[in-house]
Swiss-Prot record:
Name of this protein: Small ribosomal subunit protein bS18
Pfam families associated with the record: Ribosomal_S18 (PF01084)
Role according to the record: Binds as a heterodimer with protein bS6 to the central domain of the 16S rRNA, where it helps stabilize the platform of the 30S subunit.
Subunit structure of this chain's protein: Part of the 30S ribosomal subunit. Forms a tight heterodimer with protein bS6.
UniProt-listed SUPFAM superfamilies: Ribosomal protein S18 (SSF46911)
Annotated source species: Methylobacillus flagellatus (strain ATCC 51484 / DSM 6875 / VKM B-1610 / KT)
Length: 75
């Protein structure tokens, strides 16, 4: 119960900023949802709603395919 007191409420960044569609060309936005290894951060950590998480996943995969984002980190 004490642990619940210190948790911050997560919010959906896309809903708060009024973004309707996640664009694969917006690389700066997509980088915020990818960890240092190149993996997509899950919605339970970022607080993104399911609708936008699906769009985000598709956008990241498209950006990777077009070489806008790396598949993995630089080893």
């Amino acid at each position: 119960m004490a642990r619940d007191m210190f948790k911050r409420r997560r919010y959906c960044r896309f809903s708060a900023e009024g973004i309707k569609q996640v664009d694969y060309k917006d690389v700066d936005l997509l980088k915020d949802f990818i960890n240092e290894n190149g993996k997509i951060i899950p919605a339970r950590i970022t607080g993104t709603k399911a609708k936008y998480q699906r769009q985000l996943t598709t956008a990241v995969k498209r950006a990777r395919f077009l070489a806008l984002l790396p598949y993995t980190d630089k080893h």
